[in-house]
A protein has these predicted regions:
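Short, solvent-exposed loop/turn positions at domain surfaces
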Residues: 50-53, 126, 165, 243, ...
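Non-catalytic DNA-recognition/assembly elements of restriction-modification systems
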Residues: 1-16, 40, 139-154, 169-206, ...
């Protein structure tokens, strides 16, 4: 086992990418930017080209890119030739692994380790936004085992990563099944009513944050952001504050984010199982439905593309990054008029799909725990 600095593992000096502007994809050269790399280390579907192509920034199979600035500083991408001809942008730094010392996959997996994450947190220079420069990355020092041991580690981590990816794909397919069923059942109904026809009240909570652990917790906006309730998105309430019962999160609730980014304002989720002692903040509304509405139907209705378009159109704000929507504007949004009996049939279908999701989520959780355990073992 040897110890190296990152700069000593790269065949080239750690280099910033191209300063070219992005333009429409030319069918030949893709421009890889920070925003194109997702949390799984994959490239997104928004394909663009650089307006000028300089071959010095062309990626070669096995190159590893490091994000040097912005909210995603520290994020990495392992380039493979199967991604096609690519040039990398200036907010990324390239490492060309010396494969006589380190496998590209091993370096990439290292960037998922607790040691690397600790380095990112301790190294960020925050001025207008977080930043880690090439020198800081180059001085990052870590243990590197023999190539044969690296190969063994890579094989095991890839096996678990494959299981994790499969489980995530299963969850996405189940989500798509619900969306497809919604379209199948409701596409023929008239857009002749408003959201207010289904909702009796939009009830906001109270946002307070304690400095110490407390049995009572308040949700963060992120609990509703991506369509599924995330009970891990919370803060502790002050120990001397007694929350109102009407602000409590309950099983069967629909919650709506009244303030978020322009794309996510109005995001909502459904609570299949409420955690104990959890309460609403003022940025999330608890939806009180009328007798003619099924909460699960309302949850899925609010994710309909046309509803999302109307919400975005009616929202606003003084900040370019945060928008909000008022209760009256949300309630006046046009929507389909569906009998509650049909809504209930759809809700029963969603509940059955959710049972399958729980099984997959539990399997995913076990795979995640195994992956984290292996990372702790291999990257000390």
């Amino acid at each position: 086992m040897n110890r190296y600095k990152l700069k000593d593992l790269s065949l080239n000096k750690l280099e910033y990418g191209s300063g070219a502007a992005a333009c429409e994809y030319d069918g030949s050269t893709r421009y890889v930017r920070i925003t194109d790399i997702d949390n799984e280390g994959n490239l997104g579907e928004d394909v663009v080209s650089p307006n000028t192509v300089d071959d010095k920034y062309l990626l070669n199979d096995g190159d590893v890119l490091f994000a040097r600035t912005g909210a995603t500083v520290g994020k990495t991408y392992l380039y493979r030739a199967s991604a096609g001809r690519c040039i990398y942008a200036g907010f990324l730094i390239r490492v060309v692994p010396n494969q006589e010392l380190i496998r590209p996959d091993y370096l990439y997996y290292f960037t998922k380790s607790p040691q690397y994450k600790g380095f990112v947190q301790s190294s960020m220079k925050v001025v207008a936004q977080p930043n880690i420069n090439a020198k800081q990355y180059g001085d990052l020092e870590f243990n590197v085992p023999s190539l044969s041991e690296q190969d063994s580690i890579i094989e095991k981590l890839k096996a678990v990563s494959t299981v994790i990816a499969l489980r995530k794909t299963e969850l996405l397919k189940l989500d798509e099944l619900i969306k497809a069923r919604f379209v199948e059942l409701f596409s023929e109904y008239e857009w002749s009513t408003t959201i207010g026809n289904y909702i009796a009240e939009l009830r906001g909570g109270k946002s307070l944050a304690g400095t110490e652990p407390c049995k009572n917790k308040v949700l963060k906006t992120g609990a509703a952001t991506f369509g599924w309730f995330d009970p891990e998105q919370y803060k502790f309430l002050p120990q001397d504050y007694e929350p109102l019962q009407e602000h409590k999160v309950e099983t069967g609730d629909v919650m709506i984010s009244r303030m978020n980014t322009p794309e996510l304002v109005g995001a909502c989720s459904y609570v299949f199982e409420a955690p104990e002692n959890m309460y609403y903040p003022d940025r999330l509304w608890k939806v009180i439905t009328k007798n003619n509405a099924n909460p699960i139907f309302i949850w899925q209705l609010l994710w309909d593309p046309e509803i999302r378009r109307q919400i975005k159109e009616k929202s606003g704000g003084t900040s370019g990054t945060m928008h909000n929507i008022s209760k009256p504007k949300l309630l006046e949004i046009k929507c389909i008029d569906v009998p509650v009996t049909v809504q209930n049939d759809f809700a029963d279908f969603v509940k059955q799909v959710d049972k399958s999701k729980v099984v997959v989520q539990n399997a995913l959780k076990k795979a995640d725990i195994l992956f984290d355990s292996l990372m702790q073992t291999y990257f000390r």
